[in-house]
Each structure stands twice: as structure tokens, then as C-alpha cells.
């Protein structure tokens, strides 16, 4: 029996897809937590969880001033496999 994906997992799937399609380019900042929460109809905790996972995968970097998209070349093959699921 499968369970429905969590809100954070849904956000991860959408953001990684948008990054791979070039909607967010390397070096570009993602929208603020507040803006993402409004867009996805979720709380900021789910946004933080999604961003943390994307950072662990090497897709984005969190720094003062916001979350920036990393170049795809920096991602490992394992990450690329995850992205293409």
C-alpha cells in the first residue's frame, strides 16, 4: 500500500523539475520562503524541508540573501538519477 507524498516531497518534485527545465538558472535565486509557501499553499516548514533536501542533493545552495540554484555539473550521477525519477 503506497502513501501519498508529503507536501515537502511535492514541492521538491515541482522545484527540481523547474530547475531541470531551466525555469531557474544556475546562480539565480529562488523565490522567498514566504512566496513559495503562498504559491504552494503550504506552511514555511514544508518549504524549509524541501529546500533542505534540495541542498543535500546539491541542487541549490543556501546562503545569506537567499537560496541559489547550483550548476547541474556539480550534481553527482546519483543526484541526476533522483532528479529524473
Language-model regions: role of each:
Residues 1-85:
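Short linear motifs at protein or domain termini
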Amino acid at each position: 500500500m503506497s502513501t501519498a507524498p508529503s507536501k515537502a516531497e511535492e514541492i521538491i518534485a515541482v522545484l527540481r523539475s523547474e530547475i531541470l527545465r531551466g525555469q531557474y538558472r544556475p546562480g539565480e535565486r529562488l523565490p522567498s520562503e514566504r512566496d513559495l509557501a503562498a504559491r504552494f499553499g503550504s506552511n514555511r516548514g514544508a518549504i524549509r524541508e524541501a529546500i533542505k533536501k534540495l541542498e543535500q542533493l546539491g541542487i541549490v545552495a543556501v546562503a545569506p540573501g537567499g537560496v541559489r540554484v547550483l550548476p547541474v555539473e556539480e550534481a553527482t550521477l546519483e543526484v541526476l538519477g533522483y532528479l529524473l525519477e
